[in-house]
């Protein structure tokens, strides 16, 4: 079969710093697929992950841990693709691979480009057959699930019977982290952005309770549920919600800092913490990154896969279809429009 000569790609049109990111910051256009050269691979995109951390690479500020996206290259994120043609050792036509994939229907990547993308750790990994659902590789068996695993097992280290309050609980990381914490014997209270999401947490995932963080009585709601406060706060959002939770915690207690999605549009660099609750409650604040546990990643993925297979972890996905939906899928994370992991499928024949 002849290789495609035209493709569509989604580009960032301008940076957004100190203002909300919108669909107007992206454009999708058709262009030629250049001829394959030595040490390059031609990929058909099957599925793309959209993740909050990508927002930091759309600000124009060079203080983030991944480089800023440029306007002359498509945006990229973790994705799954099929090899259509290859002049790169180790990859054959028909291979299905996981890595940092362009927001394109079809793309050409060089070995240098693959190695230079920290989103994927500079790797393009061949997936073994038979394939699991593609959302698993981008969610619970990908960076999302690994972040949740090491956030709980490595950083939180919950003791049986401890109570954990978890923000962003209906998101990709939060929904997995809460289930892992329960498997380790913790009581989990989830915070989510709507009554419907709270119902998903309690009825589908088995959380002990869930609260709507938008409630004007959140402090009272937390204290009514936990008069002595939680032992652990697993923070995915930062901002005012986190300050509220910290003001209700027992003495002493632990705060595990995983993400600050509420602050990603802040030009000053994020959440400025009021340390008074930390001081008054004797809180221990700890941050982590899944990269700190790189040598243990394979074991974490194997354990997560086992938990899925035996029904101990339920996967939640919000699925979009087609390249043109990628910006909306990404922005919906910040609008509260997703439940669980957000994935865009570009090939209708795969799931």
Regions found by a protein language model. Give the residues of each.
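Short glycine-centered segments of the SAM/dcSAM-binding site in methyltransferase folds
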Residues: 96, 163, 187, 253-254, ...
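Mid-domain Rossmann-like dinucleotide-binding core that forms the NAD(H)/NADP(H) cofactor-binding site
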Residues: 138-216
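Glycine-rich phosphate-binding loop and adjacent beta-alpha segment
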Residues: 202, 240-313, 347-351
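Glycine-rich beta-strand-centered segment in the early N-terminal region that forms part
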Residues: 32-50, 59-103
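C-terminal hydrophobic helical "lid"/dimerization subdomain
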Residues: 1-5, 294-351
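Short amphipathic alpha-helix with an adjacent loop that forms part of the alpha/beta core around
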Residues: 217-228
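NAD(P)H dinucleotide-binding glycine-rich loop of Rossmann-like/cofactor-binding domains
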Residues: 75-82, 90-168, 312
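N-terminal Rossmann-like NAD(P) cofactor-binding module of classical short-chain dehydrogenase/reductase
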Residues: 98, 165, 211, 233-234
């Amino acid at each position: 079969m002849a290789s495609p000569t035209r493709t569509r790609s989604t580009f960032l049109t301008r940076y957004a710093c100190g203002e909300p990111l919108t669909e107007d910051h992206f454009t999708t256009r058709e262009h030629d697929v250049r001829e394959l050269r030595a040490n390059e691979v031609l990929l058909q995109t099957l599925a793309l992950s959209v993740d909050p951390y990508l927002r930091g690479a759309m600000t124009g500020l060079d203080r983030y841990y991944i480089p800023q996206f440029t306007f002359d290259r498509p945006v990229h994120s973790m994705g799954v693709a099929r090899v259509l043609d290859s002049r790169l050792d180790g990859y054959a036509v028909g291979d299905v691979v996981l890595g940092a994939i362009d927001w394109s229907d079809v793309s050409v990547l060089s070995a240098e480009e693959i190695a230079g993308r920290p989103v994927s750790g500079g790797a393009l990994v061949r997936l073994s057959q038979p394939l699991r659902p593609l959302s698993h590789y981008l969610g619970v068996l990908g960076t999302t699930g690994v972040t949740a695993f090491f956030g709980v097992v490595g950083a939180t280290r919950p003791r049986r019977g401890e109570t954990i309050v978890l923000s962003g609980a209906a998101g990709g990381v939060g929904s997995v982290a809460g289930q892992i914490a329960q498997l380790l014997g913790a009581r989990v209270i989830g915070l989510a952005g709507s009554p419907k999401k709270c119902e998903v947490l309690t009825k589908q995932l088995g959380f002990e309770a869930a609260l709507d963080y938008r409630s004007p009585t959140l402090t009272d709601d937390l204290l009514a549920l936990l008069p002595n406060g939680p032992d652990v706060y697993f923070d995915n959002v930062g901002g005012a919600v986190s300050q509220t939770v910290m003001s209700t915690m027992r003495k002493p207690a632990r705060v595990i800092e995983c993400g600050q999605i509420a602050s990603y549009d802040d030009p000053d660099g994020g959440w400025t913490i009021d340390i008074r609750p930390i001081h008054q409650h004797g809180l221990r604040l700890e941050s982590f990154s899944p990269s700190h546990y790189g040598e243990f990643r394979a074991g974490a993925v194997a354990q997560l896969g086992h938990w899925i297979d035996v029904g101990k972890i339920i996967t939640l996905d919000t699925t979009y279809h087609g390249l043109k939906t990628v910006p909306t899928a990404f922005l919906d994370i910040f609008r509260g429009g997703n439940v669980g992991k957000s994935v865009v499928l570009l090939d209708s024949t795969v799931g």
